[in-house]
Amino acid sequence: MSWQTYVDEHLMCEIEGHHLASAAILGHDGTVWAQSADFPQFKPEEITGIMKDFDEPGHLAPTGMFVAAAKYMVIQGEPGAVIRGKKGAGGITIKKTGQALVVGIYDEPMTPGQCNMVVERLGDYLLKQGL
């Protein structure tokens, strides 16, 4: 299965009538493996900050997490595994696997829980596949 298929069928899928605003699978260096049409372009320093937060949980909490210059308030996640952010009525979930970052960005009416479920389910699957 191609990386694009994972994005199209597993991240951009419909959940209770809603779907993510955008999604992507990136390498740990920020290289885009696959993305939805509206996925924002990460800046290298944003990826560096995200990876540092996975290595040092809480690193982004004081400053917030920036994605394509949009600032997200970092909220409860799973140290070393999941970073969650909130911005207005929407937010972001990033799941780290052995080789990839699975990213989902949502807006209302999708809920944070729905975004978490979609992103983390694919991330957990990729981890089980050794990816």
UniProtKB/Swiss-Prot annotation:
Disulfide-linked positions: C13-C115
InterPro entries for this protein: PFN, PFN_euk, PFN_sf, Profilin_CS
Modified residues (Phosphothreonine): T111
MF-aspect GO terms: actin monomer binding
Keywords: Actin-binding, Allergen, Cytoplasm, Cytoskeleton, Disulfide bond, Phosphoprotein
A GO cellular-component term linked to this record: cell cortex
Keyword Cytoplasm: yes
Chain positions of motif Involved in PIP2 interaction: 81-97
CDD domains linked to this entry: PROF
One Pfam family, short name: Profilin
Gene3D superfamilies referenced in this protein's UniProt entry, alphabetically: Dynein light chain 2a, cytoplasmic
Subunit structure: Occurs in many kinds of cells as a complex with monomeric actin in a 1:1 ratio.
Note: The variability of the residues taking part of IgE-binding epitopes might be responsible of the difference in cross-reactivity among olive pollen cultivars, and between distantly related pollen species, leading to a variable range of allergy reactions among atopic patients.
Family of the protein in this entry: Belongs to the profilin family.
Protein name: Profilin-6
